[in-house]
Amino acid sequence: MRTYSPKPGDADRQWHIIDATDVVLGRLASHTATLLRGKHKPTFAPHMDMGDYVIIVNAEKVALTGAKLEKKRAYRHSGYPGGLKSQSYAELLETNPVRAVEKAVKGMLPKNSLAAQQLSKLKVYKGAEHPHTAQQPQTFEIGQVAQ
């Protein structure tokens, strides 16, 4: 029997919606990365993008454990000398919670050419509203929430 190798047309993409209310950021990111890569499917192939679309709502209500809210810092660089900027996750979640979730998910995707393609299937929204009701997303439950 020959080994099955999936073709690009074999990708059966579904839409999932995740409510980030009181979900720990790292746990949310790891489940999201698994869905984006397609590792939950029996047709997973590491060299192809077989993943699903993921919608994350209520990004502003995501939780961080311990003292990470004040001590963990998010960095970015302008490209100019002395252009390193940093801010705590408390400031980042207050100003741009979508960026905080995208940054966590991006860190859990592989560092190769497929990462940008997989990350483009991630849709993050600050509040509960999203424009993807026509795609009929299925609710994806994450078992543990922050206490």
UniProtKB/Swiss-Prot annotation:
<dbReference type="InterPro" id="IPR036899">
    <property type="entry name" value="Ribosomal_uL13_sf"/>
</dbReference>
<dbReference type="GO" id="GO:0006412">
    <property type="term" value="P:translation"/>
</dbReference>
<dbReference type="InterPro" id="IPR005822">
    <property type="entry name" value="Ribosomal_uL13"/>
</dbReference>
<comment type="function">
    <text>This protein is one of the early assembly proteins of the 50S ribosomal subunit, although it is not seen to bind rRNA by itself. It is important during the early stages of 50S assembly.</text>
</comment>
<dbReference type="GO" id="GO:0003729">
    <property type="term" value="F:mRNA binding"/>
</dbReference>
<dbReference type="GO" id="GO:0003735">
    <property type="term" value="F:structural constituent of ribosome"/>
</dbReference>
<dbReference type="InterPro" id="IPR005823">
    <property type="entry name" value="Ribosomal_uL13_bac-type"/>
</dbReference>
<dbReference type="Pfam" id="PF00572">
    <property type="entry name" value="Ribosomal_L13"/>
</dbReference>
<dbReference type="GO" id="GO:0022625">
    <property type="term" value="C:cytosolic large ribosomal subunit"/>
</dbReference>
<comment type="similarity">
    <text>Belongs to the universal ribosomal protein uL13 family.</text>
</comment>
<keyword id="KW-0687">Ribonucleoprotein</keyword>
<dbReference type="GO" id="GO:0017148">
    <property type="term" value="P:negative regulation of translation"/>
</dbReference>
<protein>
    <recommendedName>
        <fullName>Large ribosomal subunit protein uL13</fullName>
    </recommendedName>
</protein>
<keyword id="KW-0689">Ribosomal protein</keyword>
<comment type="subunit">
    <text>Part of the 50S ribosomal subunit.</text>
</comment>
